[in-house]
Every structure is written in C-alpha cells, then in structure tokens.
Amino acid sequence: MLEREMMNLLDVCYDKALQGVLPGEKSIEELAEDYLAKTSSREKAIDKLIGYQTVLCGTNGFITGLGGLLVLPVTIPTNVAGVIYVQLRMIAAIAHINGYDIYSDQVRTIAYACLTGSSAANILKNMGIKISEKMAVNALKRVPGAILIKINQQVGFRLVTKFGQKGLVNVIKMMPLVGGVVGGVFDTGMTLTIGNIAKKVFSE
C-alpha cells in the first residue's frame, strides 16, 4: 500500500465515520452524547467508549464486514479499513466529548496522527505540538495548513509501515486456532493504545 492510498483511505474512513455506515448507526455527535448521558463525567464517558471500541476491533468478522461497506480501491484490505474506521469513530467521539470541532481540518489531522499509536507524540512534537500538554480548542484552531500537510505526510509513512507489520499478523491468522487470537490481540491492543493517546491529546 502506498502513502497516497493510505491518506485516501483515512479521508474516506473519517468522512464515513462521522455519520456512520451501518444501518441505524449513530453519528459521532449522537454517539458521544449517548455515552455522556450514561456516565457521570466526560472522563468516564471516554473510558467507556474506548473499552467498547476496543472490543469491536477485536471482532474479526465484524471488522471485515464493516470494511466491505466502505467504497475503497481493491488494493485496500477490508479488515484494515474496518479497523481504521472503528478507531477513527472512537477518536472523533473523544474529540467531540471534549468540545473540539470534528469537522475542522486540524482535528481531522490530529486524529490521523493518533492512529500511529506511540509514534503520535514524536510526529506532533516535530511539528511543535506537545502531546503532554492540554491542547486548548482555540490553540488547535491556529495550527497552520502547512503544518497539517507535514503531519499528514509523516502519518501516511508511519501507517503504511504499521499496517505492513499487520500484514505479517494476517499471515499468522491463516493458522488454525492461533490465527484469530493473534489478530484479535494485535487489533485490540493497538486500539486501546490509540484511545488513550486520543484521550490525552483531545483533553478538556
């Protein structure tokens, strides 16, 4: 998969994630408000959201079927698209819960950076954005377009590498019994990490 294809995949998944692709699936705003209504604080709502989305990413049949609903080039594996879709819904919902504009280019780009997992801190730091500090909503709005382009370039490279490693996991998935367990652990582990990073980046 090329970096250009990866960025196209991210754009498709993010746009679809905001409104949902499954019948009856809630928009990000509705999803976020639903979690807020069922918990006593924003932090608890986010933790519950992360937990549920992490479980979804470990369900291989659901993820593969979900990826098939997205209109994508044949070179994009449906399970990869499905995982990214679920993870972006989680990240966008976290951002919305804490008051960020999920339709802005800035939030979209930072959401993409979160998908790189532990690499997100270095990518953002290189662009002058410190993940260890609370990113005020107004401060994020001031991140210039040129910086967003550079972040996207680094994100594309990291994600192509990341899902290349996932390809090795997919080979293992073909092994009876062991495959499903290994693949599920890989997806759930990454989703949990990504969720916690998004929680830190898109803080109140």
Per-segment meaning from a language model:
Residues 66-72:
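Short coil/loop "hinge" linkers that interrupt or connect long alpha-helical coiled-coils or helical hairpins
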Residues 1-66, 85-204:
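Terminal, membrane-proximal amphipathic helices
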Residues 73-82:
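Selective recognition of hydrophobic, aromatic-rich stretches within alpha-helical transmembrane segments
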